[in-house]
Amino acid sequence: MKILRKNHPLLKIINHSFIDLPTPSNISSWWNFGSLLGMCLVIQILTGLFLAMHYTSDTTTAFSSVAHICRDVNYGWLIRYLHANGASMFFICLFIHVGRGIYYGSYVLSETWNIGIILFLTTMATAFVGYVLPWGQMSFWGATVITNLLSAIPYIGSTLVEWIWGGFSVDKATLTRFFAFHFILPFIIAAFALVHLLFLHETGSNNPSGLNSDSDKIPFHPYYTTKDLLGIFLLLLVLMILALFFPDILGDPDNFTPANPLNTPAHIKPEWYFLFAYAILRSIPNKLGGVLALVLSILILAAFPLLNISKQHGLIFRPVTQIIYWIFIANLLVLTWIGGQPVEYPFTTIGQIASITYFTIIIILIPVSNTIENNIIKL
């Protein structure tokens, strides 16, 4: 009898992706974060679906509907906090996943890498529109400030902002369309994630040594399914600790106040996972320049395959670039910290230095260190 999973038209696809997939035998736990991102997406879609059953996207009732979910719906408080903190877990996994891709040179698989960048941008868009939905003070003013950035685009900026708002300010029309976007985007992310996997399985996965591993492959199941399961259990453990013991630790206190267009919060800031980009935006005094820097802070990831001139794959045997990489990570943490600080001395100066360092490392220092290491190999 033929094995069903190898011959059935649908099961065959699953088999080649998750069961009989030839996988390098030496991939470490840093490769777990792809499956963890998949798990985060499933959690977000499921919890979001149950929240959407009780949420109303109207400016007069949105805030009270969130309060109703937490107070009156069975385990509504848990679903809400799993969804809110699940977003933070999603971005933690996302940052580690991208960081691992940079460290181990996964950007040489350019199609997979570029779809990954699209996924990153789509996830950021989803998180942004989702943050507006509770209609608290920070939701409202965050939406106002960030959407207003589009007015920096020459000629069409103001029209574009009013088109997105659906009026002359952030109001009912904005909230309704943001809810619609927040509902549909995760499914688009899921579709892109499948394309991401498709391209990855065309070339095969990278491995920590950066060497060709064709001669040393093992089946994905049971070796990496069990390894992924361990990662998933650890992720769920951290998520449950966050949701049950520290549910509001990553939120903003201003969001416990209903949105009020007549009262501006002292410090408008986005969620913690956007702070690095927000710090870069604020570091440039010119509005259009700030918006361009903000967009480039993410799109510069697409430059990694173009700027790669190293003769070695990944940073495992490249000590000079390793040092620069860890300076880059430290710099990102500094930017995240600065993004949450008020716009005053010395924070503005530190932010400007960190922003310049961010782009300098990627555009200048990494290619220079690649050249140095290439010359060392020749010695």
From Swiss-Prot:
Heme b b566 binds at H97, H196. GO terms for molecular function: metal ion binding; ubiquinol-cytochrome-c reductase activity. It is a multi-pass membrane protein. The gene is MT-CYB. Keywords: Electron transport, Heme, Iron, Membrane, Metal-binding, Mitochondrion, Mitochondrion inner membrane, Respiratory chain, Transmembrane, Transmembrane helix, Transport, Ubiquinone. GO terms for biological process: mitochondrial electron transport, ubiquinol to cytochrome c. The chain crosses the membrane at residues 33-53, 77-98, 113-133, 178-198, 226-246, 288-308, 320-340, 347-367. Gene3D superfamilies: Cytochrome Bc1 Complex, Chain C. This is Cytochrome b.
